[in-house]
Swiss-Prot record:
Enzyme Commission (EC) number: 2.3.1.46
Compartments where located: Cytoplasm
Important for acyl-CoA specificity (site feature) positions: 111
PANTHER family linked to this entry: HOMOSERINE O-SUCCINYLTRANSFERASE
GO molecular-function term, one example from the UniProt record: homoserine O-succinyltransferase activity
HAMAP family documented for this protein: MetA_acyltransf
GO cellular component, one term: cytoplasm
Functional description taken from the UniProt entry: Transfers a succinyl group from succinyl-CoA to L-homoserine, forming succinyl-L-homoserine.
The reaction(s) this protein catalyses: L-homoserine + succinyl-CoA = O-succinyl-L-homoserine + CoA
Protein name: Homoserine O-succinyltransferase
Length: 313
């Protein structure tokens, strides 16, 4: 949250140059505060586990957040009961007339399938297109990040020969984005995917900014220049056991998966896993919710044209 300071305080310029979030008394006095309304499109097989992971991160911020859960209406969930889906999830038709402060689109186990061949691809495209006019900021995770970059910006992904699974070191490519406030120079994040985006294509795209990358895992954080779309190539929401559960599942299916890198102590699946990314995941979601949702969204959600541009912040 911001530090409130007197108007024209000389320290303000220094603090802002250091990427410290300060707010003048005049601006603070004119702020309206209400709960943030966030929609989650949950595409992961285990709905309840993913709900818990994302709500854990959203609940670690000082903001009050009202959450709606969204499903693809004609896609039956194999791992979650119909009662749960009907009780807690909404179809797109029930929310298309609404506006939201934030939208989170999760990953999905579809890494080797062409986007156009995904059975509910038309629904995904429709929701992404809708979000560009009805949501202040969209957070795309893993598969959804690739899908969003493909649909919105025409970037193609490369299918990997082996699944990329593990916890990798990343570095910031810039010091001055609010999203990166509080980040260490290097930080860990988990990945679990069958594809990657071309880092150079991202760098050269006029509408995109590469904020963090890894020598081993490639592009990690990509932000659209209008600050409306954040693409996260990994899984900062994963709990400690998730990569192990995926590894054991793949083993049981006879897929001969690689051992997740930098995850088990001594890289031995018989040893305990080490969670190195929880603080980063919490800070990432907190910064997104604060700087790219709360600080930009209009108080009256019925008027999305009232979004405050970064230039005036």
């Amino acid at each position: 949250m911001p530090v409130r300071i007197p108007d024209h305080l000389p320290a303000a310029e220094v603090l802002e140059s250091e990427n410290i979030f300060v707010m003048s008394e005049t601006r603070a006095a004119n702020q309206d505060i209400r709960p943030m309304k966030v929609l989650i499109l949950n595409l992961m097989p285990n709905k309840i586990e993913t709900e818990t992971q994302l709500l854990r991160l959203l609940g670690n911020t000082p903001l009050q957040v009202d959450v709606d859960l969204l499903r693809i209406h004609d896609k039956e969930s194999k791992h979650t009961s119909i009662d749960h889906m009907n009780t807690f999830y909404r179809d797109f038709e029930a929310v298309r007339h609404k506006n939201y402060d934030g939208l989170i689109i999760t990953g999905a186990p579809l890494g080797q399938i062409d986007f156009e061949d995904v059975v509910y691809w038309d629904h995904i495209r429709e929701i992404i297109d809708w979000s560009q006019e009805h949501v202040t900021s969209v957070l795309f995770l893993c598969w959804a990040a690739h899908a969003g970059l493909y649909h919105l910006y025409g970037l193609n992904r490369k299918i990997l020969q082996q699944k990329r699974s593990g916890v990798f070191v990343h570095r910031r490519t810039s010091q001055h984005f609010p999203l990166l406030r509080g980040f260490d120079d290097e930080f860990f994040a988990p990945h679990s995917r069958f594809a990657e985006m071309d880092v150079e294509e991202i760098r050269q795209h006029p509408q995109l900014q590469l904020l963090a990358e890894s020598d081993e895992a490639g592009a990690y954080l990509v932000l659209s220049r209008n600050n409306r779309n954040l693409f996260v190539m990994g899984h900062p929401e994963y709990q400690k056991s998730t990569l192990n559960e995926e590894y054991q599942r793949d083993l049981s299916q006879g897929l001969d998966p690689n051992v997740p890198q930098n995850y088990y102590r001594n890289d031995d699946p018989k040893d305990d896993a080490i969670a190195r990314w929880h603080s980063h995941g919490s800070l990432l979601v907190s910064n997104w919710l604060n700087y790219y949702v709360y600080q930009l969204t209009p108080y009256d959600l019925s008027d999305m044209t009232a979004m405050t541009p970064w230039e005036s912040r």
